[in-house]
């Protein structure tokens, strides 16, 4: 509409941002193919199942770290079934940890050094003597503080399950399945671990070179 109706001249395509997205997707795909993402989900599952009472506080930190490392919020999908199941088993409203976990994964996009959002912002500020480290020094603590505040607020969202009539009705009607969700096993643990290490090392390298 702006081009054909109002006659505005289109700008050049954001090649840098597009190449960054391609690079991140390619690297994340390699890590997934090597089993690295499955290994990370396995670690997250162990952490959450060992600390079920702290699920509302830990789940947003887990999804935040996942997205921060990978540069995309899509990697957090794999851990959401674990969060929902652990919360239900602990008689904690699943919407509490799930809601803030999804928000945390999106907040981490603006703090991740390899996300398209951060790269786009860096390209826009390139002429103002602002480095990647300058952006991260603001975005990381701000998003982390916001996520933690949101997690504490989520502790009091909705009724307790023991007082929720809809939950009690579904329990009485045996609508809940007894099957437990388990994260996908890792066939080659060494290769999976190596892929995670390489990916994290590459992320650190981007931060150092971008500074």
Language-model region placement:
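Hydrophobic alpha-helical transmembrane segments of polytopic
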Residues: 55-59, 98, 195-199
């Amino acid at each position: 509409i702006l081009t054909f109706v109002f006659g505005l001249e289109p700008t050049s395509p954001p090649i840098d941002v597009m190449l960054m997205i391609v690079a991140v997707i390619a690297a994340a795909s390699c890590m997934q193919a090597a089993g690295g993402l499955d290994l990370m989900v396995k670690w997250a599952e162990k952490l959450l199942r060992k600390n079920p009472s702290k699920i509302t506080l830990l789940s947003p930190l887990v999804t935040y770290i996942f997205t921060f490392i990978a540069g995309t919020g899509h990697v957090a999908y794999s851990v959401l079934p674990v969060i929902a199941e652990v919360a239900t088993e602990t008689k904690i409203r699943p919407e509490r940890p799930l809601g803030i976990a999804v928000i945390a994964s999106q907040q981490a996009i603006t703090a991740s050094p390899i996300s398209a959002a951060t790269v786009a912002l860096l390209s826009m500020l390139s002429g103002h003597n602002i480095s990647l480290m300058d952006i991260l020094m603001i975005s990381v603590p701000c998003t982390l503080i916001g996520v933690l505040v949101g997690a504490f607020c989520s502790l009091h969202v909705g009724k307790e399950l023991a007082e929720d009539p809809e939950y009690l009705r579904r329990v009485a009607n045996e609508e809940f399945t007894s099957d437990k969700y388990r994260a996908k096993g890792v066939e080659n643990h060494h290769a999976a671990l190596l892929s995670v290490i390489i990916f994290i090392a590459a992320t650190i390298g981007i931060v150092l070179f971008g500074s």
